[in-house]
A protein has these predicted regions:
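Bacterial N-terminal signal peptides
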Residues: 1-7
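A short helix->beta-strand "capping" segment at the edge of beta-propeller domains
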Residues: 11-28
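Beta-propeller blade-edge and WD-like acidic-aromatic loop motif
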Residues: 11-16, 39, 43-64, 78-109, ...
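Conserved beta-propeller blade repeats
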Residues: 25-43, 69-88, 114-134, 138, ...
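Hydrophobic beta-strand positions
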Residues: 32, 54, 99, 121, ...
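Residues at the C-termini of beta-strands that transition into short coil/loop
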Residues: 56, 69, 101, 114, ...
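Serine-hydrolase catalytic core recognition
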Residues: 320-499
Length: 499
């Protein structure tokens, strides 16, 4: 009774304070285990901005590794040095490769060449790194010796060497012109994979490092290709793709003859997969009504093994095995809590949380959870502010399906008294407007459109305002999804009203 009276006596916190708490909430994602299996590096906003940190795999307090004003885009350990890391930092809006260690030494640039730098992969002994430098239309595939820091460009052998060009092969500059991801390196170190965009469609390219020529592995019609992984013997390349089907699944490409076969495509989209270092196990994350479900399969039999499930949520990025193949590491998003690094030890019970990102003065009960609804033929998610009988609505549309997980932008609008309806797919805007018109417990007047991906707005007159992502050039209000100005968002949603 005393606790109840004290609760009732506490005044409701004002909106500016709640938005401040939201802005202070952090996240952690993109785990990368160390070669010796003792630590895991990851990306986080615990220290302000997108920085790199590391933590002992058995638990502890995270150590901040970087302090880059532009933030960090990627991180991985150097295979030959357990405490040395390669990071991709954003400097002057360019991706730059830096080498650093966990002992606090300043990060050192690997290559002074201008342009964006894409890491591809280390040789097995960790003594050489392959990467691409792209500056405008110029693309250069390079390697660097980690001990001497000597940079070498991958170039074709001289004509006198007698090398024969493969029929249909491409120059590296042509093959990498639409590069958006590089790697992995083949186990024998003779070739490297690249993901590119050609003629408006994604494709997988395999580059021969000795001949400095490349070939298309996927000369198909429009499709997505993601997360390429070699088998331990280098004969097979696994890739996440929707080629020839409506949802993403795992295919295997035989490197020698370029044939492709389906390995696992259950019907529901796959968000990520990982092949163990011994090549005998395939871990997959399957989208089930917006939430991810893990499965573990033997290769090549595809016999399903039991796998403990983390709390209901969705992946933040991919999944990765540690080197012994004893545990899976992944970033995990929850509906009412921060995104953090989790580990799943095979045969050791439930997954455990490695990091606990701060959310000061923000209890889990204070974060509204979404409800699954139907907007026409589409599945939709509705976040409602508590204790408001008929709130105004903001409609969220995006290129990819919205997940029912904690989002600062949605929580800020809920705190400000707006409901958020997330609808995806063709006709999403019309379906959302029809849903609002039919809903008796929502105010259909003056809806706000949240359009972070800059999708075409079918009828601007139907919306009281439009919130776009940065540099989308469609007018309205711009909001950075990685570092949103929540107060500006709420002011715009309230049509300029004070907080």
């Amino acid at each position: 009774m005393l606790a109840l009276l004290l609760t009732l006596a506490v005044p409701a916190e004002d909106l500016p304070a709640r938005l401040r708490h939201l802005e202070s909430a952090a996240a952690a994602w993109s785990p990368a285990p160390s070669p010796d299996g003792t630590r895991v590096a990851f990306l986080t906003t615990m220290f302000g901005g997108r920085q790199a940190a590391s933590i002992a795999l058995e638990g502890g307090y995270p150590t901040q590794l970087t302090d880059e004003p532009g933030g960090i885009a990627e991180i991985r350990y150097v295979p030959s040095e357990p405490r040395q890391l390669l990071v991709v930092a954003l400097r002057d809006d360019r991706r730059r490769l830096l080498l650093m260690d966990e002992d606090g030494a300043p990060p050192a640039p690997l290559d002074a060449a201008a342009g964006d730098q894409f890491p591809g992969g280390f040789t097995r002994d960790g003594k050489k790194l392959f990467y691409v430098v792209r500056d405008g239309s110029k693309v250069s595939l390079r390697s660097i010796a980690m001990d001497t820091r000597k940079v070498s460009e991958v170039v074709p052998p001289p004509p006198a060497a007698g090398a024969q060009r493969a029929v249909g092969s491409l120059s590296l500059e042509d093959a990498f012109s639409g590069l958006f991801a590089l790697g992995p390196l083949s186990p024998d170190g003779r070739s490297i994979v690249a993901l590119v965009v050609r003629s408006g469609s994604e494709a997988v390219v395999l580059a021969d490092l000795q001949a400095a020529r490349a070939e298309l592995l996927t000369p198909d019609k429009a499709a997505r290709f993601r997360q390429p992984r070699f088998s331990p013997d280098g004969r097979t390349l696994y890739v996440l793709t929707d080629a020839g089907r409506s949802a993403l699944g795992v295919d295997a490409i035989t490197v020698q003859d370029r044939t492709r076969r389906t390995v696992y495509a259950p019907g529901n989209p796959l968000d990520a997969f990982a092949v163990s270092d011994d090549g005998h196990r395939l871990a997959v994350a399957v989208d089930s009504t917006g939430l991810d479900v893990f499965s573990l399969l033997d290769l090549p039999s595809l016999r399903v093994q039991p796998l403990a499930a983390p709390p209901a949520g969705a992946l933040a990025g991919g999944i990765i095995w540690d080197r012994p193949g004893e545990r899976l590491l992944f970033g995990w998003r929850l509906a009412d809590d921060t995104t953090d690094i989790w580990q799943l030890r095979l045969g050791r019970g439930s997954p455990t949380r490695l990091t606990r990102s701060p959310r000061p003065a923000l209890s889990r009960n204070a974060i509204p959870r979404p409800t699954l609804v139907r907007a026409g033929e589409a599945q939709a998610w509705l976040w409602r502010p508590p204790d408001l009988p008929k709130p105004r609505v903001a409609v969220l549309i995006s290129e990819t399906p919205t997940r029912p997980v904690f989002d600062k932008r949605i929580a800020a609008l809920n705190f400000a008294g707006l409901a958020v309806l997330a609808v995806n797919g063709p006709g999403a805007q019309r379906a959302a407007l029809a849903f609002l018109k039919a809903a008796e417990d929502l105010d259909p007047r003056d809806p706000l459109l949240l359009n972070p991906d800059g999708l075409p707005v079918e009828d601007p007159s139907k919306w009281s305002g439009v919130v776009n992502g940065p540099r989308k050039g469609q007018g309205g209000h711009e909001l950075d999804p990685d570092d949103p100005d929540l107060r500006a968002l709420v002011r715009y949603a309230r049509r300029g009203g004070a907080l």
